[in-house]
Amino acid sequence: MPARICSTVAAAAMAAMIAMPASAGDFRLTSPDMPDGRMPAAQVLSAAYGFGCDGDNRSPALTWEGAPAGTRSFVLTVHDPDAPTGIGWTHWVVANIPADAQGLDTGASGNAARLPAGAVETRTDFGLPGYGGACPPEGREHRYVFTLTALGMEALPVATPEAMPALIGFFANAHALDKAVLEVRYGR
């Protein structure tokens, strides 16, 4: 895809994500691993990534309820809008989560047996598919926004392990029925 088209798709995806408000209804996303709104060490990036953090890099458990009528699948994204990149940092993308799923288990990332059947983890801003935990610069606290988007289609045909976050965001927003948002914080 030419660079100009990629830039256009990325800009459109970001605009669509910002333009759609979080749900004011019954659609809710929660995490038993982060009940106080703080990200514990288990969900922080591991030393192996070379960013200076020393967590377990384990994806958190998430549960949801109240999805809108007509939901046929979900997309989950985890984004740090405070990352010093100018556009934030995407830490996790899971697409094609079946409509009958009610959550994800702790440590589901990277373990197909723990993800709902048909779910696909796509690339993140780490350049690989799967969960990459929080690791803000020292002395800074960042927000980590978990967004579950209910879709009116069964699967995003562009959802492959190689798909970039902006591509998934663009198509998810084009088919979004509603969103549930959970914001947690982490600083070091």
Each language-model region and where it sits:
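Bacterial N-terminal signal peptides that target proteins for export
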Residues: M1-A10
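Absolute N-terminal positional cue centered near the fourth residue
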Residues: R4, M17-S23
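Bacterial N-terminal signal peptides
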Residues: V9-A19
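N-terminus-centered regions that define maturation/targeting leaders and the start
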Residues: A22-R188
